Amino acid sequence: MNFGYRETIDKQKDLVSVQRKVVSKSLVGVLKVFLYLLVLLIITVGFLGLGLLHGIIKSAPSVDDISITPSASATTVYDSNNKKISTLVTSGSNRIKISLDQVPDHLKWAFIDTEDSRFYEHNGIDVQGIGRAAFIALTTMNPSEGASTLTQQVLKNNVFTNWTNESSFLASFKRKIQEQYLAVQLEKVTSKDKILETYLNTINLGSNTLGVEAASRRYFNKKAKKLTISESAVIASITQNPSYYDPILNPKHNAKRRKKILKNMKAAGHITKKEYKQALKDDVYSRIQKVNNKIEKNSNSINSYFVDEVINQVMADLQSIKGYSYTQAYNAVYSG
């Protein structure tokens, strides 16, 4: 038998085995170094992230120094018979403030059931809502589901008022973090009802209206407390995108959103199945067009000349008697 050949083969196998062990140990060593560096990187990024968040929160305004109540409101002009003939507004002032008890329950729930269904449960930020919005965005590749609570929207509309001018992701990210932080702080010192009241008085509802009372009068020529379920759903539909869901300019878009809001209200048990069906059958948009036609007709009436004269006289008196500048007089007249 050829033992020399077998010994050579065995030695070659042993050599290959040793080489494999060396390579294996080297790979394990490289893997350990890689994992160590990865953990170190994660820890470093984590600390940097915490430092960034701490800096952003530290630079946020104090909850004691902010005001969520808007100062400007619309000015109403009456004739000698105490009949309203015009409403004067400037940018950010076309609102008519009302208390929460003047808002019908179905109007409150029209907003809550769609914009912030856990409003009475969360502490200012809705972690479940954030998770749901993230899941929908990832699965549909369409980040259309909002995660901002009503409290955050109140802060955005009344404290972080320059959010529309944000030109970078970092600016938006910073504002969002401060918004969430202040939302939690605000709910520690402010009741849910007060936050809801402020929200309903400050949201942009299209056609140069702010708040549900101004919107109710603009679209339906009635006070908010007299709105029907169908009409409430129309107004609540606007807030997600005031231009796109404007019931005068884009009634079809608004109708689609309105149907979703009515479904949410029914699912939450805030309207019955019968009320839901009745609301869907309501020819609400024809009424809106009639009101709009009347408003446009009145804006071209002789009253407009009378109103212009009243404005000029009041502004002149404010400047001559009160010592106002032209700008101060203008703001006083048009901002309530």
Which ranges hold each PLM region?
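Active-site oxyanion-binding pockets that recognize sulfate/phosphate
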Residues: L37, I248-P251, S335
